[in-house]
Amino acid sequence: MRTRIKICGLTREADVDAAVEAGVDAVGFVFYAKSPRAVSVAHAAALARRLPPFVTPVGLFVNAAPHELAAACAAIPTLMLQFHGDETPAQCDAVGRPYLRAARMTPGFDLLNFAQQFSSAQALLLDAYVEGYGGGGKVFDWSLVPSGVTPPLVLSGGLSAANVTDGVLKVRPWAVDVSSGVESAKGIKDADAVRRFCEAVREADARVAASEI
């Protein structure tokens, strides 16, 4: 199985183009004002129009009001939602869009129970716990991930070309998500780093395929 790839925190046309060129499956736009990678709905919509078919735009939200979610969905008709705050299952479902739900991994966190609560999610995005909200660019202990979790898992948190191969081999996620690990500055992606990250994911997939022969 091919591991899907999402690049998050895009703010520039050139970075969207580089991600598409590298073969990513999804790109993320941050709609959280406190993030250095935050973009307006109008800017995100303009960036999303550069995406070819079968590359999914994803909007990251933290405790957003219903009207904010509705505005983003109206501006970007194909938008998938990613909830990174304290949203309840009912709040996530109420929008009526496919969504990812972030889980902040710490020792003792009951991911199986969390997965049951958010069984309607398209996937659970596993990130390291940091103070505040949003990704902190930190790697969590991958051994905390139990087997048999549904829905599918998206591995996130401090990934880069240097460690994503190992992460895919150990966790076997449906997808991986990276932001700071492919940046030259906050919100500014490095096209070469994006390319190397994607190559490292494909290297992991090749190893998995070889082991199954």
Swiss-Prot record:
Gene3D superfamilies for the chain? Aldolase class I
InterPro entries listed in its UniProt record? Aldolase_TIM (IPR013785), PRAI_dom (IPR001240), RibuloseP-bd_barrel (IPR011060), TrpF_fam (IPR044643)
The record's section on SUPFAM superfamilies has: Ribulose-phoshate binding barrel
Per the record, the pathway is:
Amino-acid biosynthesis; L-tryptophan biosynthesis; L-tryptophan from chorismate: step 3/5
Give one Pfam family: PRAI
| Keyword Amino-acid biosynthesis in annotation | yes
GO MF terms listed in the record are: phosphoribosylanthranilate isomerase activity
The answer, when asked if Isomerase is one of the entry's keywords, is yes
EC number from the UniProt entry: 5.3.1.24
Annotated HAMAP family: PRAI
Report the PANTHER family cross-referenced here.
N-(5'-PHOSPHORIBOSYL)ANTHRANILATE ISOMERASE (PTHR42894:SF1)
Query: Which protein is depicted?
Result: N-(5'-phosphoribosyl)anthranilate isomerase
- Taxonomic lineage from the root: Bacteria, Pseudomonadati, Pseudomonadota, Betaproteobacteria, Burkholderiales
Gene name in the database record: trpF
